[in-house]
Amino acid sequence: MALLSEGLDEVPAACLSPCGPPNPTELFSESRRLALEELVAGGPEAFAAFLRRERLARFLNPDEVHAILRAAERPGEEGAAAAAAAEDSFGSSHDCSSGTYFPEQSDLEPPLLELGWPAFYQGAYRGATRVETHFQPRGAGEGGPYGCKDALRQQLRSAREVIAVVMDVFTDIDIFRDLQEICRKQGVAVYILLDQALLSQFLDMCMDLKVHPEQEKLMTVRTITGNIYYARSGTKIIGKVHEKFTLIDGIRVATGSYSFTWTDGKLNSSNLVILSGQVVEHFDLEFRILYAQSKPISPKLLSHFQSSNKFDHLTNRKPQSKELTLGNLLRMRLARLSSTPRKADLDPEMPAEGKAERKPHDCESSTVSEEDYFSSHRDELQSRKAIDAATQTEPGEEMPGLSVSEVGTQTSITTACAGTQTAVITRIASSQTTIWSRSTTTQTDMDENILFPRGTQSTEGSPVSKMSVSRSSSLKSSSSVSSQGSVASSTGSPASIRTTDFHNPGYPKYLGTPHLELYLSDSLRNLNKERQFHFAGIRSRLNHMLAMLSRRTLFTENHLGLHSGNFSRVNLLAVRDVALYPSYQ
């Protein structure tokens, strides 16, 4: 096997693909895997002997060799047994085993972001991508860029919702105090993921500051690791974390070679890149993946600090207690991220007198003529215009200091009210026309039975009554075509009664006289003229009404955006003059 792998390792560089997908030989080397197992099992001497025997180049420097030996955990060691016990207890506490072929660890649900997270859906636009670079040490002069530490602290202070930190080592006191102050005073949630191998340095800093990170209500500290290599002997090699980025509110991210240490902020040379916009979505996804793979602080590390009595609460803490204390905070956070501010409620200012007076007015409009009604209620309409305008406003609208969106809402409300008033006016005009036509028919019959022997007076009374009927029924009328049809039928009915009355068998003595024949011819001639005059007037009014209705319909459809439906009736007479007599130029 070693000879076969040697042939794979000695593939010339020309066979490797400089572009495109890498070859399998570039991704995996069996000889190097065997050399790594020799290093873990026998140490540096066995590793060097294997390289000489297989004629392999030295692919690990001495520092890497010592780092791998320190990171290796053998099955019989105390640390590996404690870690396995902790994992078993963690899995048994959740009791998520499905009893199928798959192992128990695949059935464990990932930890939740219990402190809240920005409500960005997948693919949501986060703005244009922008890049801002900082270097340590910073440039000379007042106009030089900020240092990495100063730029990072400035970004942390600008957070409003959440801060997510992924770091290898965290020992800077100033940055930790900034995060602690942001949690307590601004109510910003802070997630910290640290390398498991370097977590002891973070706990040493907290012990020196006499700070308990697990007691912070809006701060969570967990550990992550790099890739894990498993040898055939059962030994596993745990990789380190070299990812360094800080996610702020889901819209900005600070990444680079800068670590949260005093030496990187003052002595070491480092850089920091601040990204904003759509590129932050990738860092958002990466942090959620790392948080799902993270683990709480290991009891093994806490045992080293039990002698100082500063972290006793971490050993005996209950995970459920933190969830109970953060329940209300989580609801408030989710509500603030996903909901809009509520508008102030305004009490309707419409008095009860307006409602009480509206009913008798509606009853009178069906029996009294429009001229009398307008003359008796014109002053009252002018006094009630302000009150009706106030009642048309919805109670959810905020009247003082309106914004642009609220003005658009009131415009749509005014449109709905105008459409409501036009529809109800049509019904009132049709009911008045029908009532007056019936009363006119009754008066005409009475005039014929009583005043017909006088001749001239009876014939002159009928056209006048018909004129009054036609004028009262069609003047100031903005109803539909059906209401005008009722007017035409009402005016035509007295004329038909008049023509049949001349042939009534109750008056045979007048048919043979010459004066009666002249009178009949003149009256018929006048009746035809009056009939033509009335028909022409009715036709012109109908044409005018159809034109007015067509223009009004076009206006409401194009400009008001009126929708059909049932509307509530509000003060119809306040806009009657405008609706019935528009000025067309």
Swiss-Prot record:
Q: Does the keyword NADP apply?
A: no
Tissue-by-tissue expression = Expressed in the testis.
Where are the stretches annotated Required for interaction with KIF22 and function in chromosome congression? 340-585
Q: Which residues carry this modification: Phosphoserine?
A: 298, 462, 568
Annotated spans, Disordered: 338-384, 439-501
UniProt region (DUF1669), positions on chain: 1-299
The extra comment attached to this record reads:
Was named CHICA (girl in Spanish) because it interacts with KID.
For domains, the record's comment is: All members of the FAM83 family of proteins share a conserved N-terminal DUF1669 (domain of unknown function 1669) domain of about 300 amino acids. This domain mediates the interaction with casein kinase 1 (CK1) isoforms. Therefore, it has been proposed to rename DUF1669 the polypeptide anchor of CK1 domain.
Pathology noted in the record is:
Probable proto-oncogene that regulates cell proliferation, growth, migration and epithelial to mesenchymal transition. Expression increased in hepatocellular carcinoma, promotes proliferation and cell colony formation via activation of MEK/ERK signaling. Expression increased in breast cancer; may be a prognostic indicator of poor disease-free survival.
Q: What name goes with this protein?
A: Protein FAM83D
Q: Which organism is it from?
A: Homo sapiens (Human)
